[in-house]
Amino acid sequence: EEILQHLNENLGFLDGAVITGGEPTLNKDLPEFIKKLYELGLKVKLDTNGTNSEMLHELLEKHLVDFVAMDIKCCFENYDKITNSQVNIEEIKKSIDIVKKFPNYEFRITIAPGITKEDIVKIGEYLKSRQANKILAIQQFRPGKCFDKSLEKFPKTSESILEDFANLAKSYFEKVIVRKE
């Protein structure tokens, strides 16, 4: 209710809302919250890591989001190591297949410590094989407020590394975007 009140008070300055992490699809009340955003006349962008394909399917089936950005952390075989948690890769794959059917989406990968060119190749090959290769955003890692505190000691990803990864990704994706600070 606090969030909705704040948004309502600032409607003159807003045209949309971004729903982001933790992982918003883990909240069972998310569809109802989004309906309230639409009642305010706002567009909705959802940021997700793809770990709850069932909720993602419901949101897209009911046309409750205008844009989906799904993070893919790394190649599938390294997910547990890179995320420092156990991840159900089949859920990620199901989510990819759901998102690709939606007209307004992008996949994103943050070039964080431990991410390699091999990750880009494997992600690119997989998404292309699933016809889910419309847009990839290559994002700059920025230390600060990292869930994994051990990452705080690393510098932000250099622009030259971002460009190298983006150039590699262009072999697999229709469009590659580089996002820096």
Identify the function of each model-found stretch:
Residues 163-181:
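A C-terminal junction/extension of Radical SAM enzymes
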